[in-house]
A protein has these predicted regions:
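Acidic, Mg2+-coordinating catalytic module of metal-dependent nucleases/exonucleases
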Residues: 96-102, 107-108, 145-206
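Residue-level signal for well-ordered alpha-helical scaffold segments within enzymatic catalytic domains
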Residues: 32, 83-86, 90, 107, ...
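Acidic active-site catalytic centers that drive phospho-/nucleotidyl reactions
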Residues: 9-11, 31, 105, 128, ...
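Conserved non-catalytic scaffold segment of RNase H-like nuclease domains
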Residues: 2-6, 11-100
Length: 215
């Protein structure tokens, strides 16, 4: 089964979930050849007893349009995360979570999925585009910020801090990087294809399933 790359962007009011809330999220699902096969986005109600981190809220004041966009048509997190997991499961391939950097976005998404649905359709794993950029570019890891990457890696898409815009822009970037990686494989005489997933992932901790009770 071919992999489907689920480019995901999260907007939040702090650095970690629980004390702070995920305000908005969006995913754009791409095939390896950059066909967009679907999107999912939602603006979420705040978590009970959570509050914005002062530094994050200071930053949000510099992005009033993006703030307004993520605070309209608010949805219940439990309902939306259940719908999101259903959407991921219906994708026509093995879903791979993709983000730049994955450490931030996957932390929020994994926490919300586990809390409100008890499972993650991505298992425990996320593909970090920053690490991928390091491997492709030869730049040191901390230098792998978007302004330092080759301009021809990017499509002419906006980065607005509106989750869906950013998920689409990031997904196109990933597919361009994936194409470059495939070219490198071809130059080495290796098959010019994305290797298919073979078996479902085992839990990261022996004896622990990635599914837990949502009660």
């Amino acid at each position: 089964m071919a992999e489907i790359y689920v480019s995901t962007d999260v907007e939040a009011d702090g650095p970690i979930p629980g004390p702070h809330s995920m305000l908005s999220f969006a995913s754009a699902a791409y095939t390896a050849d950059k066909q967009l096969i679907g999107t999912f986005s939602a603006n979420l109600e705040l978590l009970p007893d959570a509050k914005g981190h002062p530094l994050t809220m200071k930053w949000w004041k510099t992005e009033p349009e993006a703030w307004a966009a993520c605070r309209q048509d608010l949805q219940d997190p439990k309902t939306e995360m259940k719908e999101y997991v259903k959407w991921v499961k219906k994708l026509p391939g093995k879903a791979v979570f993709v983000a730049y950097p994955a450490g931030f976005d996957f932390t929020f998404m994994f926490w919300y999925m586990m809390k409100f649905t008890g499972e993650s359709p991505f298992s425990w794993s996320a593909l970090d585009m920053k690490t991928f950029a390091m491997a492709l570019s030869g730049l040191p890891y901390r230098s792998c910020i978007k302004p330092k990457l080759p301009k021809d890696w990017f499509d002419d898409l906006p980065h607005t801090h509106v989750a869906l815009d950013d998920a689409l822009e990031q997904g196109a970037l990933f597919c361009n990087m994936l194409s470059l990686w495939q070219q490198h494989r071809q130059a080495l005489g290796l098959p010019n294809e994305v290797m298919p997933a073979v078996e479902p992932e085992e839990a990261a901790v022996p004896g622990v399933s990635p599914r837990i009770s949502s009660e």
